[in-house]
Amino acid sequence: MAKTSAKNIRPGELNLKEKLVHINRTAKVVKGGKRFGFNAIVVVGDKEGHVGYGLGKANEVQDAIAKGIEDGKKNVIKVPIVKGTIPHQIVAKFGSAKVMMKPATPGTGLIAGGAVRAVLEMAGIHDILTKSLGSSNPHNVVKAAIKGLQSISDAYDVGERRSKSLKEVFES
């Protein structure tokens, strides 16, 4: 598995956009009633192969979203995109959320639902087939999608692992 480290990507140099995936209102019961808080899942990306996600928690919605964006910028990964799609099929699991992603031919479009769609849009993938199985919890679905995108190996990674040139990889 080719793991792209978030350490060597500088989010300040990227033109990152953000997309809100989910807002959840939480309630803490105290002596005087209920105290409400909010958490927000935000996906950030430049639509050119960089994507990250963040979770923000605060007493106000706007503060939670801002914290989520900041957290997302710290977790940016690089996704290898080949002709608007991914190089190979992936099945990733996080908790009981399972996400299956298949490469598609140009013109197919982004066939994904909910949280997975937000991740793929921000990554800049235009043609892909996906299916979300198991839990539909947005937290775990986003994490499974990111985990899957992080595990993608392109031809350069395979050549590096095998100590072969790009030409030798395609011949074997």
Swiss-Prot record:
Subunit structure of this chain's protein: Part of the 30S ribosomal subunit. Contacts proteins S4 and S8.
GO-annotated cellular components: small ribosomal subunit
One matching Pfam family: Ribosomal_S5
Entry-linked InterPro entries: Ribosomal_Su5_D2-typ_SF (IPR020568), Ribosomal_uS5 (IPR000851), Ribosomal_uS5_bac-type (IPR005712), Ribosomal_uS5_C (IPR005324), Ribosomal_uS5_N (IPR013810), Ribosomal_uS5_N_CS (IPR018192), Ribsml_uS5_D2-typ_fold_subgr (IPR014721)
Protein name: Small ribosomal subunit protein uS5
Domain (S5 DRBM): residue spans on this chain: 16-79
Biological classification of the source: Bacteria, Pseudomonadati, Chlorobiota, Chlorobiia, Chlorobiales
Keyword Ribonucleoprotein carried by entry: yes
GO BP: any one term: translation
Gene Ontology MF terms in the entry: rRNA binding; structural constituent of ribosome
Keywords of the record: Ribonucleoprotein, Ribosomal protein, RNA-binding, rRNA-binding
